[in-house]
Amino acid sequence: MNFEQARFNMVEQQIRTWNVLDTPILQALSCLPRERFVPVAYQSLAYTDTEIPLGHGQLMLAPKVAARLAHDLELQGSETVLEIGAGSGYLTALLAQRSKRVIALEIVPELAALARANLAQSGITHAEVRVADGAHDTPAEGPFDAIVLGGSVAEAPQHLL
């Protein structure tokens, strides 16, 4: 499979059509190899408009959703960002491309380890993945310039607001 062509098509046909037009975000999406963040069994689907199972009952966001989240934060490069739900680390990597620092919390230890490995393999050095429950745990580094919920929650964690 030609992942470079698939990545280009994803940006042009999925991301731009969702009004994600910020050049730095588009550039990050164009350069970040999403297939590294997807389980091997699903790599052929890495650039499709679908959620991808990560195991442990968790799903990787569809590319356009991850892109829209990163876009709507309007990060300028000086922010410290908290991400709740790191998953495989793809959204973490996108956020790291546009911020000073990302602290990502992941409740599943195996996924936290996977995210750390994926970030390291991608050369992302200013993002940290911790095993923690974002619904209850608050990193000492707060307050944060932006907080992203990378998964669904029954209600927003009040301690973060």
Annotate each predicted stretch with a short phrase:
Residues R7, A62, L91:
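Hydrophobic (often cysteine-bearing) scaffold residues that line and stabilize catalytic clefts
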Residues A41-Y42, P53:
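Glycine-rich loop at the start of a catalytic domain that most often binds anionic cofactors/ligands
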Residues T23-P24, K64, E110:
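Cytosolic histidine kinase catalytic core of two-component systems
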Residues M1-A41:
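N-terminal auxiliary segments of SAM/dcSAM-dependent transferases
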Residues E74-L161:
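Conserved nucleotide-cofactor-binding alpha/beta core module
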Residues L29, L69, L160:
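Residue-level signal for inorganic ion chemistry
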Residues E12, R16, A46-T50, H56, ...:
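Conserved alpha-helix/loop element of class I SAM-dependent methyltransferases that forms part
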